[in-house]
Amino acid sequence: MKGNTIITDTELKMDVLAELRYEPSVRITDIGVLVKDGAVTLNGYATNYCEKCDAVRAAKRVAGVRAIADDIEVKLPDSIRRTDGEIAAAAANQIDWSTTIPRGAVEVTVSEGQTTLEGEVEWWYQKNAAENAVQYLAGVTGVTNAITIKPKLAPGDIETALKSALARNALLDAKTIRVETSANKVLLRGTVRNYFEREEAERVAWAAPGVYSVENQLKVEWPWRRAE
C-alpha cells in the first residue's frame, strides 16, 4: 500500500517551474521561482501584462502551493507600446462592447500603462469581466480594479444560501469551510486543499445575492502530502 510523503520546497519549486514551462504563453527563461514553506514568489519579467497573469495562474494550479507573491515586472517591447491615450480609448471600447458590463458603469484611467478601473456594478462577475476585458490589451503594464459592488437586491439569508452553494459545489469540500456573515459582508475561514479551491470558494461567496464584501481567510493545508 502506498504511503504519503511531505513535498519539500525544492520539489514544489520544480513542480511550479514545470507548470510554467508547460504554459505556452509564458517565457520561462525570464521568470524566477522562490519557495519557502509552500509560499511561492515569482520574479523576473514578462513582455506583456497577460503573460504576467498567465504565469501567476499557472503557479496557482500546482498542488501544494499555499500562497503566491507576484514580483514579476512587465517590460514592454517597442512593438506593443502604446500611449496612455490609446490604451484608455481601447480599454473603454472593450468595456463598452461587453454584454456583461452595464454601459457607462466603469471609468478607465491610464498612467504609464497602469490601467485603473473605477465605478459601481451590481455583481462581482461584472467587476471581474471589466478587468478581463482590458488585461490583454497591448501597452497595458498593470490593472488596478477599484470597481465597487453595490447590490440592488436586498440581502436574504446569505449564510444559508452560501452554505448550500458550497455544499453542492463538486470542486469544494464544504465541511472544511466556515461561513460568517454580517449584513452584506461574508467572512470565509477554514482550510482548503489547494489555491484553486481557495479562489473557487471566494467566487461562490461573491455570487450570493446581496453580497458586497468578501474577506477570504481560507488557508491552504500545509504540509501538503504526495502519494509515494
Walk through the language-model features, giving the residues of each:
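N-terminal targeting leaders
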Residues: 1-228
